[in-house]
């Protein structure tokens, strides 16, 4: 349970889970650098897993229902087939800036349960890193995940809000050993849940010191 709690810290600690086993996990693709500093990667893959884990809220029996939910998650397990495909684009101009854009479509086929609860259908990752001077780096990272569902007692599932997060990171290098950094998370103040019933913080900031050994 320790390993699974590193993935979902809200998991019911009394649960006993079967180990997941991958019988196939393959990816193929084409990668090419079509111009100086620019390359693309078109890829697709297929994965077969026995006893894949899908996190859903804990539902109380009718006699115990308050708000229906307990304060833990449970893990449904089912044999799953996962097909995916996407494209990854990157562009780098000297040492001034880097741009990346990645889109992935996921298709799930699961046994015994109606849906791949909690898994996104579409994912988009984008980022840009700018280095105006050698000591300063600023990065903007965006992640969008759509098409997620959770289980609230009805087999067809309930739609979850899209993950829609924009983060900003800035670093300043003082010397070869020390540096400063500032990270602003969810600067769009979006409200969503990574796991149903546990909303993510709408905004957070972190400042610190980098030490290179």
Question: How should these model regions be labeled?
Answer:
Residues 9-10, 69, 170, 179:
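Short, functionally important structural connectors and interaction interfaces within domains
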Residues 26-28, 32, 42, 85-87, ...:
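Membrane-embedded beta-strands of outer-membrane beta-barrel proteins
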Residues 105, 116-213:
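Conserved C-terminal beta-signal and adjacent last beta-strands/turns
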Residues 27, 75-77, 167, 186:
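Asparagine-centered polar/low-complexity signal
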